[in-house]
Amino acid sequence: MKITQERDITTIRQTVIFSASPEQVYEVLMDSEKHESLSGENANISREVGGAFEAWGEHISGFNLVLQPGRRIVQAWRAHDWWTDHYSIVTFDLRTLDGGTELRFTQIGVPPHRFDGHFRGWIETYWQPMQELCDKGSVSDQTRGASAAARQRIDQGSL
Protein backbone atom coordinates (compact mmCIF):
# COMPACT_ATOMS: atom_id res chain seq x y z
CA MET A 1 0.00 0.00 0.00
CA LYS A 2 1.24 3.47 -0.85
CA ILE A 3 -0.23 6.52 0.82
CA THR A 4 0.56 10.05 -0.24
CA GLN A 5 -0.46 13.16 1.55
CA GLU A 6 -0.52 16.74 0.32
CA ARG A 7 -1.06 19.91 2.23
CA ASP A 8 -2.46 22.84 0.35
CA ILE A 9 -0.68 26.03 1.27
CA THR A 10 -1.13 29.64 0.28
CA THR A 11 0.87 32.86 0.14
CA ILE A 12 0.08 36.26 1.65
CA ARG A 13 1.61 39.37 0.08
CA GLN A 14 1.10 42.84 1.54
CA THR A 15 2.83 46.20 1.08
CA VAL A 16 2.58 48.84 3.81
CA ILE A 17 3.98 52.37 4.08
CA PHE A 18 5.01 53.59 7.55
CA SER A 19 5.99 57.09 8.67
CA ALA A 20 9.07 55.78 10.47
CA SER A 21 12.58 54.85 9.38
CA PRO A 22 13.44 51.30 8.25
CA GLU A 23 15.58 50.96 11.38
CA GLN A 24 12.64 51.86 13.62
CA VAL A 25 10.29 49.43 11.84
CA TYR A 26 12.94 46.70 12.08
CA GLU A 27 13.31 47.34 15.81
CA VAL A 28 9.57 47.11 16.48
CA LEU A 29 9.57 43.69 14.79
CA MET A 30 12.82 42.37 16.33
CA ASP A 31 13.14 43.91 19.79
CA SER A 32 11.21 41.93 22.41
CA GLU A 33 10.18 44.97 24.47
CA LYS A 34 9.16 47.02 21.45
CA HIS A 35 7.20 44.09 20.04
CA GLU A 36 5.41 43.83 23.39
CA SER A 37 4.60 47.55 23.08
CA LEU A 38 3.02 46.81 19.71
CA SER A 39 1.07 43.75 20.76
CA GLY A 40 0.45 44.14 24.47
CA GLU A 41 1.50 40.48 24.79
CA ASN A 42 4.70 38.73 25.85
CA ALA A 43 7.43 38.41 23.24
CA ASN A 44 10.83 36.75 23.38
CA ILE A 45 12.73 37.41 20.17
CA SER A 46 16.31 36.34 19.50
CA ARG A 47 18.37 38.80 17.49
CA GLU A 48 20.59 36.03 16.10
CA VAL A 49 20.29 34.05 12.86
CA GLY A 50 19.09 30.59 13.90
CA GLY A 51 17.71 31.99 17.15
CA ALA A 52 14.15 31.29 18.25
CA PHE A 53 11.28 33.66 18.87
CA GLU A 54 7.87 33.56 20.53
CA ALA A 55 5.27 36.31 20.28
CA TRP A 56 1.68 37.06 21.14
CA GLY A 57 1.90 35.15 24.41
CA GLU A 58 3.41 32.06 22.72
CA HIS A 59 0.67 31.90 20.07
CA ILE A 60 3.40 32.46 17.46
CA SER A 61 6.84 30.82 17.36
CA GLY A 62 9.69 30.11 14.99
CA PHE A 63 13.30 30.95 14.26
CA ASN A 64 15.29 33.55 12.36
CA LEU A 65 16.71 32.65 8.95
CA VAL A 66 18.04 36.02 7.70
CA LEU A 67 18.54 39.23 9.68
CA GLN A 68 19.77 42.40 7.95
CA PRO A 69 19.12 45.28 10.37
CA GLY A 70 16.99 48.00 8.83
CA ARG A 71 16.63 46.02 5.59
CA ARG A 72 15.32 42.48 5.84
CA ILE A 73 13.95 39.82 8.20
CA VAL A 74 13.23 36.25 7.09
CA GLN A 75 11.77 33.82 9.63
CA ALA A 76 10.38 30.31 9.81
CA TRP A 77 7.06 31.12 11.46
CA ARG A 78 4.15 29.10 12.82
CA ALA A 79 0.96 29.56 14.79
CA HIS A 80 0.43 27.32 17.81
CA ASP A 81 -2.54 25.51 16.25
CA TRP A 82 -0.93 24.60 12.91
CA TRP A 83 0.21 21.12 11.92
CA THR A 84 2.97 20.13 14.34
CA ASP A 85 5.78 20.11 11.79
CA HIS A 86 4.60 22.98 9.59
CA TYR A 87 6.30 26.37 9.33
CA SER A 88 5.60 29.18 6.91
CA ILE A 89 8.34 31.50 5.72
CA VAL A 90 7.77 35.19 6.43
CA THR A 91 9.82 37.92 4.81
CA PHE A 92 9.83 41.57 5.81
CA ASP A 93 11.68 43.66 3.19
CA LEU A 94 12.20 47.29 4.22
CA ARG A 95 12.95 50.16 1.85
CA THR A 96 13.48 53.84 2.61
CA LEU A 97 10.94 56.26 1.17
CA ASP A 98 10.75 60.03 1.57
CA GLY A 99 9.54 60.44 5.13
CA GLY A 100 9.09 56.77 5.83
CA THR A 101 9.47 53.11 4.98
CA GLU A 102 7.91 50.72 2.52
CA LEU A 103 7.50 47.26 4.03
CA ARG A 104 6.95 44.44 1.57
CA PHE A 105 5.66 41.44 3.43
CA THR A 106 5.37 37.87 2.16
CA GLN A 107 4.23 34.79 4.06
CA ILE A 108 4.62 31.56 2.09
CA GLY A 109 3.01 28.38 3.37
CA VAL A 110 -0.12 29.51 5.21
CA PRO A 111 -2.60 26.63 5.64
CA PRO A 112 -5.60 27.49 3.44
CA HIS A 113 -8.10 27.22 6.28
CA ARG A 114 -6.13 29.96 8.08
CA PHE A 115 -5.51 32.27 5.10
CA ASP A 116 -8.33 34.78 5.65
CA GLY A 117 -7.65 35.10 9.38
CA HIS A 118 -3.92 35.56 8.89
CA PHE A 119 -4.38 37.99 6.00
CA ARG A 120 -6.60 40.20 8.20
CA GLY A 121 -4.49 39.48 11.26
CA TRP A 122 -1.34 41.03 9.81
CA ILE A 123 -3.27 44.18 8.95
CA GLU A 124 -5.22 44.47 12.20
CA THR A 125 -2.65 43.27 14.73
CA TYR A 126 0.62 44.41 13.15
CA TRP A 127 0.32 47.08 10.46
CA GLN A 128 -2.47 49.20 11.97
CA PRO A 129 -0.97 49.31 15.50
CA MET A 130 2.49 50.00 14.00
CA GLN A 131 1.07 52.91 12.01
CA GLU A 132 -0.62 54.26 15.14
CA LEU A 133 2.75 54.19 16.91
CA CYS A 134 4.36 55.93 13.92
CA ASP A 135 1.64 58.59 13.81
CA LYS A 136 2.21 59.33 17.51
CA GLY A 137 5.93 59.66 16.80
CA SER A 138 6.65 57.06 19.44
CA VAL A 139 7.68 53.95 17.52
CA SER A 140 10.88 53.73 19.52
CA ASP A 141 9.50 54.30 23.01
CA GLN A 142 5.76 53.50 23.07
CA THR A 143 4.61 51.41 26.02
CA ARG A 144 2.21 48.47 25.76
CA GLY A 145 -0.39 49.39 23.21
CA ALA A 146 -2.38 46.76 21.31
CA SER A 147 -6.09 47.09 21.65
CA ALA A 148 -8.14 44.52 23.50
CA ALA A 149 -9.83 43.73 20.17
CA ALA A 150 -6.47 42.91 18.57
CA ARG A 151 -5.56 40.60 21.44
CA GLN A 152 -8.97 38.92 21.19
CA ARG A 153 -8.39 38.24 17.47
CA ILE A 154 -5.12 36.51 18.36
CA ASP A 155 -6.85 34.44 21.04
CA GLN A 156 -9.50 33.42 18.51
CA GLY A 157 -6.88 32.30 16.01
CA SER A 158 -7.07 35.16 13.51
CA LEU A 159 -3.29 35.34 13.39
Language model features with spans:
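Hydrophobic ligand-binding cavity/cleft-lining segments
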Residues: 1-44, 156-159
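Charge-dense, low-complexity polyampholytic segments
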Residues: 44-45, 141
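A conserved amphipathic terminal alpha-helix motif
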Residues: 109-159
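Hydrophobic-ligand binding "helix-grip"
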Residues: 36-37, 43-44, 54, 58-102, ...
